Amino acid sequence: IELLTLVKRRRGPYYLAAGPAVQAGIPHPQNGAGNGPGKEEIPYRFVHYQQDGPIATVTLSRPELSNRVGLEMATELREVCQAVQADENIRLVILTGEGDQFSVGREVLPEDLSGSPASVSLDWLRSIQAASAIAAIQVPVIVAVNGDAMDHGLELAIAGDIRVASSGSKFGLTDLAAGAFPWDGGTQRLPRLVGPAWARDMILTSRIIDATEALAIGLVNRVVDSGRLIEETRTLAESILAGGAIAARYAKEAVSQGADLTLDQGLRLEADLNVL
């Protein structure tokens, strides 16, 4: 019980700035949208949100810029994650990108081109962080990687629980090659996923890897033909939904929090979750 209390304290509320949907008075799913048997969509500018029964599909929607992440997209993405957390009808989330790419990184602004990477303010970098909001979602999150996931795009992808990639996808954290530094969890989540050695390899060399290598090192869980990506992702989602909803949440909790605990502490957490 003490461990559960610690876990809940560490979670805490996730602060979210009001995005355009809230400012415009558009209802969130917890206010009534998405509770019926059909599909419901919540309009945003750069993030598409659709709920189909217990599945929420979140799509990065800036295909003309290969879904690069800017301030408004990041704000909307955090806002959508908050909506998902508040809707008890949602049991699983699918995160993907519109068009041929998942996301190739951060939006390049004129001031970035005229100055050094160091000139980008810390406050601005924090304002476009969104990976922690994805990781904080309590239900399983499947990331359907439809093309390249680079830099900030990869940081968003590895914040999910399971990654299904199209066969032509490529992956990389190339910030160091540009004299920059990962800022949305890349240096922390990547080594926890693939191990410190592979993480150092990718980060220090800015090397780009293909889907086959990503599968071999554990960066993605499955690789499928691009034409079958959504179908395979939905099949995987249905297999997860076939199990118990509460059990799935607790299993995710145990695995996620257990990574930061000793084995004995993790076993106690597992036992405590079993009796809730």
Give residue spans per PLM region.
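Glycine- (often His-adjacent) and acidic-residue-rich active-site loop
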Residues: N89, G97-A133, A149, G179, ...
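Conserved CoA-thioester-binding segment of acyl-CoA-metabolizing enzymes
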Residues: R10-E98
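Glycine-rich phosphate-binding loop at the start of an alpha helix
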Residues: W124-I128, D151, D184, I208, ...
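Terminal peptide-recognition signature
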Residues: V58, R62, E76-L77, L95, ...
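C-terminal long alpha-helix characteristic of the crotonase
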Residues: L3, R10-A18, F46, V164-S169, ...
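Alpha-helical segments flanking ligand/cofactor-binding loops in enzyme cores
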Residues: S132, L154-E155, Q188, R200, ...
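Short helix- or helix-capping micro-motifs
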Residues: V104-R106, V145, L190, W198-R207
